[in-house]
Amino acid sequence: MEGPSLRGPALRLAGLPTQQDCNIQEKIDLEIRMREGIWKLLSLSTQKDQVLHAVKNLMVCNARLMAYTSELQKLEEQIANQTGRCDVKFESKERTACKGKIAISDIRIPLMWKDSDHFSNKERSRRYAIFCLFKMGANVFDTDVVNVDKTITDICFENVTIFNEAGPDFQIKVEVYSCCTEESSITNTPKKLAKKLKTSISKATGKKISSVLQEEDDEMCLLLSSAVFGVKYNLLAHTTLTLESAEDSFKTHNLSINGNEESSFWLPLYGNMCCRLVAQPACMAEDAFAGFLNQQQMVEGLISWRRLYCVLRGGKLYCFYSPEEIEAKVEPALVVPINKETRIRAMDKDAKKRIHNFSVINPVPGQAITQIFAVDNREDLQKWMEAFWQHFFDLSQWKHCCEELMKIEIMSPRKPPLFLTKEATSVYHDMSIDSPMKLESLTDIIQKKIEETNGQFLIGQHEESLPPPWATLFDGNHQMVIQKKVLYPASEPLHDEKGKKRQAPLPPSDKLPFSLKSQSNTDQLVKDNWGKTSVSQTSSLDTKLSTLMHHLQKPMAAPRKLLPARRNRLSDGEHTDTKTNFEAKPVPAPRQKSIKDILDPRSWLQAQV
């Protein structure tokens, strides 16, 4: 049988305070060790900022120790007064409201400088270190330290502080601490000071100081740190935030200011603090109760029942057909409001038929909407009734925070300032173009590129990763027929600018295939005309040599596929300008020739015929 499940706060067990007692004692031991480590850091600190942050952390440790001690005393009192009685009456039972999350963020504290102080740049103004402490029960949180001078008009804290286990009666005490950071007031030579203390403090005084640390006297520790290191944070202002201050927007709160103009830590506060305080009760953000219920329906005067998986959360009862619909984020089949106007009645009178029903009545203008549900047994009915009454109590305690779920916005951490992450010298080396590290990395890149392209990177013959769109026209699937042009002695020879040999195409269908006899006739014709074209051949030789030198001096073109030419028929004796013909159409780059082929005189003669 599928029974309901309780997802809210369960009943407190008898051994729970003892477990909390152990956890708090562990936290106390941790803070004591943290405080000892901070004292060691203070003895080694040489910079002003280091001393300021260390003293601030020491104050936080002492505040947490005091809070843990008070909480431990409260738990001991609860154990002594705890009783095991259980009240069966749900209405009159003593209840405890559910816990919730409280988030405080975007704190702004305006300053009220005089015009002469704010706009005056005649001399360097005083600087102050400001931070906030948030205290609620045993929880103590702090913000970052903010430096303030007369040019600042608002003290801004970007931290988001979240209290996870807060009740509706929470009280968050906000304390603003200030310290003047003038060089004369802060000791920056702790080693000399330690040597001086070693020679001037007697053994009896040293034993008193060590006993103070061992006895965990927080006030004496703070006084000792301020006396030795010259840094002391003073309470500048404070306020208390409660449930009435919670709102899903910015709100202004009054501050109680301490000190006056004569105090070294004093700042001209306006008297207000603006922040965003958000409350998320567990009854709004989590499922208070869940289980299967049978809903009664009237269809044409007949009573029928449908089984639904119901979830009680945020002042509403969401009804689904199955639990899987919740994970799939399917819209619920039925939503029943559960608020302070809702009336719930148990109808457990028919013991023979074993029917356990309850009705949910929501008044609306002019009428009342009633939903009847049935459970499987009496135990489930008691659990559902207990969950409803607890939910009513939670809604009444958290008040306006249960009208709508407030969202907690957690901002991403900002980048720290540049001077906190690296030194100026490292930034200079990163920006320098003459850095040996930069040259070495460039050499490695070139060497890697040469290895990847098998040396073709140096001569510009690395192929493209993706061919251009028009490359499909030159995939080699088309036949190419080229008809050579016959040169006469009187005409000037035409020279290919690239001087490269094309791949021999297939012979045309109307021509005879190659034979040795035809080749011998061609050689004989060349020998007969050798004397007549001596001047032309000399010019051709010079042109070939200059072309060769030109190719050796510049990078060679990348090999590409041949251009599929159309089948052109030329009449006998017709002369065609080869250069003009190739300029009219895109010509692919010819194949690369070796040095042996370029220096062969027979290739020069073939280029002219």
UniProtKB/Swiss-Prot annotation:
Domain of life: Eukaryota
InterPro entries (alphabetical): AHD, Cytokinesis/Rho-signaling, HR1_rho-bd, PH-like_dom_sf, PH_domain
GO biological process: hemopoiesis; negative regulation of intrinsic apoptotic signaling pathway; positive regulation of cell population proliferation; positive regulation of NF-kappaB transcription factor activity; positive regulation of non-canonical NF-kappaB signal transduction; signal transduction
Induction comment from the UniProt entry of this chain: Up-regulated in cells resistant to 25-hydroxy cholesterol (25-OHC). Down-regulated in lymphocytes activated by treatment with phytohemagglutinin (PHA).
Residues covered by region (Disordered): 495-520, 554-609
Coiled-coil segments: 56-91
Ranges for domain PH: 286-393
SMART domains, A to Z: Hr1, PH
Any single GO CC term annotated in Swiss-Prot or TrEMBL for this entry: plasma membrane
Tissues where the protein occurs: Expressed in lymphocytes, CD4 positive T-cells and bone marrow-derived cells. Also expressed in lung, colon, thymus and brain.
Keyword Hydrolase assigned: no
All copies of domain REM-1, residue ranges: 5-81
Alphabetic keyword roster: Coiled coil
SUPFAM superfamilies: PH domain-like (SSF50729)
Compositional bias ranges of the Basic and acidic residues kind: 569-582
Function comment: May play an important role in lymphopoiesis.
Name of the protein in its database record: Rhotekin-2
